[in-house]
Swiss-Prot record:
InterPro entries, sorted: P-loop_NTPase (IPR027417), Rab (IPR050227), Small_GTP-bd (IPR005225), Small_GTPase (IPR001806)
Assembly and interaction partners: Interacts (via C-terminus) with GDI1/RabGDI. Interacts with YIF1, YIP3, YIP4 and YIP5. Interacts with CCZ1 and MON1; interaction is stronger for the GTP-associated form than the GDP-associated form.
Alphabetized UniProt keyword annotations: Cell membrane, GTP-binding, Lipoprotein, Membrane, Methylation, Nucleotide-binding, Prenylation, Protein transport, Transport
Location of Cysteine methyl ester modifications: 199
Name listed for the protein in its UniProt record: GTP-binding protein YPT10
Compartment list: Cell membrane; Vesicle
CC annotations in GO: cytoplasm; endomembrane system; fungal-type vacuole membrane; plasma membrane; vesicle
Functional description taken from the UniProt entry: Protein transport. Probably involved in vesicular traffic. Specifically binds guanine nucleotides. In its GTP-bound active form may be involved in recruiting the MON1-CCZ1 complex to membranes enriched in phosphatidylinositol 3-phosphate (PtdIns[3]P) or other charged lipids, leading to recruitment of YPT7 and downstream effectors involved in endolysosomal maturation.
Amino acid sequence: MEATIKVVLLGDSSVGKTSIVTRLKSGKFLAKHAATIGAAFITKTIEVPSNDSSTEKRIHMEIWDTAGQERYKSLVPMYYRDANIALIVFELGDVSSLQCAKTWFQDLQDRAQGTQVIIVGNKYDLVCEEHSGEVTIPAELQGLPYVAVSAKTGYNFDTLNKIIISLVPESQFKTLSKNNEQGNILEINKKKSGSGCIC
């Protein structure tokens, strides 16, 4: 059984959206990449853990990485359409990007109320573990799923994948023939990547 979902990443420039997409896609980190113009699109299939070995379940994600630069913001709302899940990304330790996450959330709510939202604090590798717990989520975003990650080290991406899986309703899974099964499967139960905290 497989579900196909559209995932869109939102957030200001330089918070690490493209690095998150790269980590989701390939499990790698690229230190240098060009700024996203408009939007970029990739696909990824996640295998859903199940206690029933006779039933294989997968989630095929169509992931849209949107531009965060001011001059491209007018183009971003077109990618909200039919999005099942939005990852609203901010940079840990950057209060201004967290405040801007509220603006992204409000714009999404105005245009696509049915979209599920996950708040993602990126660049965990740049802050100490004890300081990462000091993040105060704005009232407008409280109650939404939240996860702190590091696209650089891979920290907590297993948790992010599990949250994504939890937001996909059972009714969205469809039975496919073997000829339609997708490759490129991510085993989310792999040992999480190690990460260190350098202060």
